[in-house]
Amino acid sequence: MSYNRRSKNITQGVARSPNRSMYYALGYQKEDFDKPMIGIANGHSTITPCNAGLQRLSDAAVAAVKDAGANPQIFGTPTISDGMSMGTEGMKYSLVSREVIADCIETCVQGQWMDGVVVVGGCDKNMPGGMIALARINVPGIYVYGGTIRPGHWKGHDLTIVSSFEAVGEFTAGRMSQEDFEGVEKNACPTTGSCGGMYTANTMSSSFEALGMSLLYSSTMANPDQEKADSAAESARVLVEAVKKDLKPRDIITKQSIENAVSVIMATGGSTNAVLHYLAIAHAAEIDWSIEDFERIRKRVPVICDLKPSGQYVATDLHAAGGIPQVMKLLLDAGLLHGGCMTITGRTLAEELKDVPSVPRADQKVIHPIDQALYKEGHLAILKGNLAEDGAVAKITGLKNPVITGPARVFDDEQSALAAILDDRIRAGDVVVLRYLGPQGGPGMPEMLAPTSAIIGKGLGESVGLITDGRFSGGTWGMVVGHVAPEAFVGGTIALVQEGDSITIDAHKLLLQLNVDDAELARRRAAWKQPAPRYTRGVLAKYAALARPANQGAVTG
């Protein structure tokens, strides 16, 4: 039986003789035209350590595809480094790159009539970009995550990239020596791999195991380890079998499997960015999903993993403790996962987890039993109020002061806010407002890790609030609220805030409120004028023109 269901459109018949001529130039033989064509979407790049170790994984996938009797076709996908672009204009390209990656994969797979695709990625937007593409084109596919970085070490402390960001605030506050500042800088990132806490890359890759689109245990492996390359090869073999079975992404990505993915995100204390990305993935798969669904799941799924940024441990510790399968087994036994969901292996999630212990190992402290959860409810909350009629996203667990009412300190760009924090112009009790940074206004919803880390480094993490229509890094923690919708650029209430206005952030009531009377707000709204777009040409201008609101995933189509 032939499994080249799609690629035969480009390789078979008299009219395709010129096509075959070009394939012969690539080393193909006549018998190869009856084999399935498998794309390898290779995200390798020396831009960032997150992607610098992907070539080895792509090579392993290529070899496995050949061994499985199929033809590998390698093409590149772009990336930017969120960590390196953070705090600069370059960060505006981060979320945009999610759309570019999705479009890139769609273009290559559809343009070349590939029968399946192995997506290999590392940095934050690689994961949602790849999954959006798979859900959109609905061609058999699997996600191979590049793997996590190992933790750095300095004077007995484990480090991640967030340690470096927070060191900036500590050093400028005089709370860290020059020696320690440089020590953290040089030792925070000791290997290739994605940022090591339960930040955005590890959040999304972990959730892909629960979604059914990645192999078990693959999300918490360290990039340099041999098991990571072995997992990439096994992923490619599984994908070829999925092509033979005609098992497609939309057979796997369903509303129930997305609920599984979000449940794992809640249980592991994952990134706020997951809210945005799963809205986008669901949209690509044509599944009815909203921010209210996140709140519904938050109320029933506890946080059971003690992971950075708000906890103690990193992804390699989670891997040693049993990985995401151990987390999922606890959730499944508690009735918090849909075990009947199909996975890329052709087996259900419950079947995949059959041999995973029902009790986590006693010699580890990363994964807690359900009845000993760190928090009884999830951490990613949807806040609403007159400052966010369409919703905003916050991490609410672990806050010593879950309610703050204070004067607004208003900034229309990130650099001005960062300078004010580092110059000690932000004081305990203030609420920093960063606006005109939404999908259209930023454009691209840049992440605010630099100012939030500076606040923490200054020792103000529990006493200063920050709200924005932009995003936060997965490494952010504290009294911070992002994804405010409607955004300032379209006239959302956040655009009407004035310096010194009273703002309340209430994590208990899930409230984000500007304490200004309706008549005054109406006066300000009548006087407000939409600013000119920051960009009128290029990819940022294209994105700004097409982007939907944050509460719809900030998608472009």
Curated annotation (Swiss-Prot):
It is an enzyme of class 4 (lyase). One of its GO terms (molecular function) is dihydroxy-acid dehydratase activity. Its EC number is 4.2.1.9. The active site is at residue 473. It catalyses: (2R)-2,3-dihydroxy-3-methylbutanoate = 3-methyl-2-oxobutanoate + H2O; (2R,3R)-2,3-dihydroxy-3-methylpentanoate = (S)-3-methyl-2-oxopentanoate + H2O. One of its GO terms (biological process) is isoleucine biosynthetic process. The keyword Magnesium applies. The modification N6-carboxylysine is found at residue 125. [2Fe-2S] cluster binds at residues 50, 123, 195. Mg(2+) binds at residues 82, 124-125, 447. Keywords: 2Fe-2S, Amino-acid biosynthesis, Branched-chain amino acid biosynthesis, Iron, Iron-sulfur, Lyase, Magnesium, Metal-binding. Binds 1 [2Fe-2S] cluster per subunit. This cluster acts as a Lewis acid cofactor. It holds the Pfam family ILV_EDD_C. Belongs to the IlvD/Edd family. Functions in the biosynthesis of branched-chain amino acids. Catalyzes the dehydration of (2R,3R)-2,3-dihydroxy-3-methylpentanoate (2,3-dihydroxy-3-methylvalerate) into 2-oxo-3-methylpentanoate (2-oxo-3-methylvalerate) and of (2R)-2,3-dihydroxy-3-methylbutanoate (2,3-dihydroxyisovalerate) into 2-oxo-3-methylbutanoate (2-oxoisovalerate), the penultimate precursor to L-isoleucine and L-valine, respectively. Homodimer. This is Dihydroxy-acid dehydratase. It comes from Burkholderia pseudomallei (strain 1106a). The gene is ilvD.
